Amino acid sequence: MRVVVVGAGIAGLMAAQSLVKNGHDVVVVDKGRSPGGRLATRRIDNATLDHGAQFFTVRDPLFKSHVEKWIASGVVTEWCRGFDSATQNNDGFPRYRGVRGMTDIAKHLANGLDVRCNTLAFSIAPGTTSKWQLNIDDGSALNADALIVTCPLPQTYALLVTADIELPDSMMRTEYDRTICLLAVLNQSSAVVSPGGLQNPDETFSFVADNAIKGISSAVALTLHANPQFSLEHWDAPPQDVHDLLLKQAKPWIGEATVVTSQVKKWRLATPLTIWPERHWANEMIVLAGDAFGGPKIEGAALSGLSAANYLQQII
């Protein structure tokens, strides 16, 4: 079976890996420059910064079996067991990270797959020589017996306009929180303490990470995620104004250090506010998956991708 997967985040990559292992012909397309989606790591000079997902946890036995393989392969390691120093950073649940950054996980999963980045899916329509045709913005097209679409739901709606597929009303009303992220490289140690992560430390930020303490950066570099309220209120403000305000608000975490360089990254569709009750949704050999189905965490998205792949394999 020929399957095209739209989106090279963890949901799409997990689905593709599962299908390929079962002998199917799979192509993964993504508009980004590299696979990963929110498994995103950026390098600025000598600094390495995770600027999307900061870590992940494991609850489900199926996902745990995959994570154990990633650990054995040297791709993933435990970061800590909590971010509250009052409990000695230990609440019993490991937080995992990529050994050299979260994007390592995506690169590991993409290895051996036909992943085509810088490829923007434009529309889905019934095919002439296959069940479906995925049209690309450069005028080319990919034929498929089945499609797995893992991009955020607003982008999915746009793709399906020409496919004559009707989505449930509640799914079409799904909204997303936004996240504005400040990346700052420093000349000396920050005011963030071990293990290098702070959740909801103040009224501006939902997460602050020191990537050097975290263990992925040779230079001191902070990732600061503004919370949904701040991000929404300042989304359309002039970029320089947002940058300067975030730097001001970050001062308690920068401490006595000097900012060598800094930049802002914006995630418009960061976190779905409602979750579909099933791990995937399917109609006419088109399967929707991603964090809006499995839950707004790395584990949920991964399990959603596996669920989508399993569905297709069962109906063949």
Where are these regions (language model features)?
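Flavin (FAD/FMN) cofactor-binding core of flavoprotein oxidoreductases
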Residues: D244-L245, A250-E284
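Central helical "cap/lid" subdomain
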Residues: G36, A144-P195, A257
